[in-house]
Amino acid sequence: MSNMMNKAQGFGLSLITKIAGSEMLDQLKLRKFVEKSLYQGSKTGFKVLTKTQKAFKPQAIDKQRLPNQSNKNLFDLSLTEEQQMTCDAMSQFAEEVLYTLAHDADHHAQFPEELWQHLTDLGLNYYALPEALGGVAAEQNIVSNILIAESLAKGDFSLTAGLLSTFSVINAMTRWGSTQVQSMYLPVFAEDPDVTATFAFQEVTPAFNPFQLKTKATEQNGQFYITGEKTLVVLGDTADVFLVSAEWNGKPDIFVVQCDETIAIKANPAMGLKAAETATLQFNQTPALRLGDTDFDYTAFVDLGNLMWCAMAIGTCEAIKAYCIKYANERTAFGEPISHRQSVAFMIADMAIEIDAMRMLVLNAASLAEAGQPFHREAYLARLLCAEKSMKIGTDGVQILGGHGFTKEHPVERWYRDLRATAILHSGLHA
């Protein structure tokens, strides 16, 4: 396989060299156009070849399932010492790294390369991997995952979505993956931090319903194939592995797909999530594995994804509140800070009330899920509240800053755009 790839790369380079050296390009005044086209084409082609060479070979491991939290008899909002330390570390990272990178990342619509090294240093993926595979997860840590998402999102919503994409896929594979899926992918995630993964869930459909999918899965001689289109895929252009939602046997299901030549990838910048490099993916009879088996619960899968977006919305709303408090205390009008005006003070007070309400619902749903109890109702209510109130907080943040809030001089307009994803996206992450 490696020899074949090397030959393909060699042939491609020789062909590009011959075309670029042709005098005909100068005569027809096409050199600049052709060179640009060759650059883009070769860049995409070699990216696909490089990804194809990444080997995912099954290893002999036992099927992993993390036990539910056994001591969850009461809903307790107090954090454990470990959770508090994790929140402090993630909040510090969000403030010192994510916040400083966010403006340029959004402006250039590009996920910063240096963040991958930071992710390795944080060891975030090991929070999702079971102890048997070298990770630190000994039981369901859904509440801790929610707290991590909230803490990171205080720095930036889009960058957090990118950082948590592989982490979320590992969570999903650990919780739902069949023996075949786990043996093929989890050891690779444990050993190689350069392997990345994401979710291809959203479809180009008005009022998208995750239980009514246009993407289809078919089975032929025990092999699954995916056909359809997905949009707003976080880091879709660089991921090695995708978790794809598709209809199979008349029901929605989740499949594992490796990046290959049957997937057409197109950059698709959106109103928000610019730093997450969202893309549209077209699957054309793409080989796939079914994620779960007998214990897979599609509804719970969707709910756990929605809770992560809610947690990120809470973190970003906290950032808006803190920024507005600082601005309102420093900005003077008519000889006094604008925070002395009740219209401004009440808006900030409402932010605090709504953030606490959102956090309460999200943690309640996560706590039930962690204990292995039904949590669909609570997750649904949490998403409804977060979708509505996060946009209100984003709007009020822009309003408090007035004309400044509408400019890129301040981050509130970016937070406002990113928060819109809370109401639009389903799944795409996993607690």
Protein language model features and the residues they cover:
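Glycine-rich phosphate/cofactor-binding loops in nucleotide/flavin-utilizing enzymes
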Residues: 1-65, 148, 168, 401-431
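Internal helix-loop-helix
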Residues: 56-63, 91, 121-193, 235-238, ...
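Short, contiguous pre-domain boundary segments
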Residues: 63-79
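Glycine-rich beta->alpha junctions and the first turn(s) of the following alpha-helix
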Residues: 79, 154, 265-356, 422
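C-terminal helix-coil-helix/basic helical segment that borders enzyme active sites and/or dimer interfaces
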Residues: 102-107, 333-336, 352-385, 398-403
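A short, Trp-centered hydrophobic/proline-enriched beta-strand micro-motif
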Residues: 192-202
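A structural signal for short hydrophobic beta-strand segments in well-ordered beta-sheet cores
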Residues: 215-218
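A short core secondary-structure module
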Residues: 227-264
